[in-house]
Regions:
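Short, structured coil segments at secondary-structure junctions
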Residues: 56-59, 67, 75, 183-185, ...
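Conserved acidic, metal-coordinating active-site core of Asp-based
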Residues: 96, 102-103, 107-227
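Short, well-ordered alpha-helix to beta-strand connector turns
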Residues: 3, 60, 101, 156-157, ...
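Asp-based phosphoryl-transfer active-site loop
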Residues: 4-18, 93
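Short, acidic loop-to-helix structural element flanking the phosphoryl-transfer center
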Residues: 19-36, 82-89, 142-147, 201-215, ...
Length: 278
């Protein structure tokens, strides 16, 4: 069957190592859109963190955010699917991991939130400067993150714990954070590929959201293609009719994908779209 919809991860997939959308990749996306293919950015970022390069691209109407916890219709500026976490358990988890060497974040609705102390810690993270700047610009600061989460009308779409590293480059406190998180059966967690864990309701996944959007649009699983590089892309790579892994992807992702393409610094996502969808 012909490909009618493509779910695309951003960091490490559509964007190169400098967090840029190349002119060639943009051209291929525009060709796909002109051919009637539904292009769906699928990211761990919140709605407010969707880069303008994609949010403003003509023909991109839908986006999957926070690892599949929500789907937004950009044209109508509304959420058309959401699965949020339990508020009380989320606040408790944040309190229990607060003393660890991490940068905490909570995504409620379209926004990401953090405390000022964690905003100051961003500089200590082992990230490229473009990603640090994205974190600084896309988070709202609250005085007490667990209390903020508890006081909202609904639970967060996602929590994130980003690990500080020791002199040897090893994540500090990651094992303890994973141990604590593992005690919450109602949650699942994955790595976003940047030295972190991303925590969602156990029913959440990019693949689940992609299939739900396909259902709403009348698109079958066999007509859906997904491209990604990290553990948080596994759900859609495995559930789509055609799952594509980037050459720079994590080993487990490359093993589970149907096919491989070039790296994000080689316009690999564009090459896959050309080969399998155009």
């Amino acid at each position: 069957m012909a490909i009618r919809m493509i779910g695309l991860d951003l960091d490490g997939t559509l964007f190169n190592s400098r967090k840029q959308l190349t002119a060639h990749t943009r051209q291929i996306l525009e060709r796909a859109i002109a051919g009637g293919i539904v292009i769906v950015p699928a990211t761990g970022r919140p709605r407010s963190g969707l880069p303008a390069a994609l949010a403003d691209m003509e023909g991109i109407r839908y986006t999957i955010v926070t690892n599949g916890a929500a789907v937004y219709d950009l044209e109508e500026d509304r959420c058309i699917y959401e699965k949020y976490m339990d508020r009380e358990a989320s606040a408790e988890l944040l309190r229990r991991t607060r003393g660890l060497q991490t940068v905490q974040g909570a995504f409620v609705g379209p926004w990401g939130y953090m405390e000022e102390i964690d905003r100051q810690r961003i500089e200590q993270l082992s990230l490229v400067e473009e990603m640090k700047q994205y974190l600084r610009s896309s988070r709202k600061v609250v005085e007490d993150l667990p209390a903020f989460v508890l006081g909202e009308a609904r639970g967060p779409q996602k929590l994130v714990l980003m690990f500080l590293k020791d002199r040897e480059g090893r994540p500090i406190d990651s094992e303890e954070a994973i141990r604590i998180t593992g005690e919450y059966a109602q949650f699942s967690f994955v790595s976003g590929g940047v030295g972190n864990i991303e925590i969602m309701d156990s029913a959440v996944g990019k693949g689940t959201a992609l299939l739900e959007l396909g259902r709403q649009l009348g698109i079958e699983r066999e007509e859906i293609m997904a491209i990604g590089d990290s553990e948080n892309d596994m759900d859609m790579i495995c559930k789509a009719g055609l799952g594509v892994a980037m050459a720079n992807g994590e080993e487990i992702v490359r093993r589970r994908a149907d096919v491989l393409t070039g790296s994000n610094d080689e316009d690999g996502a564009a090459a896959a779209i050309e080969q399998y969808a155009l």
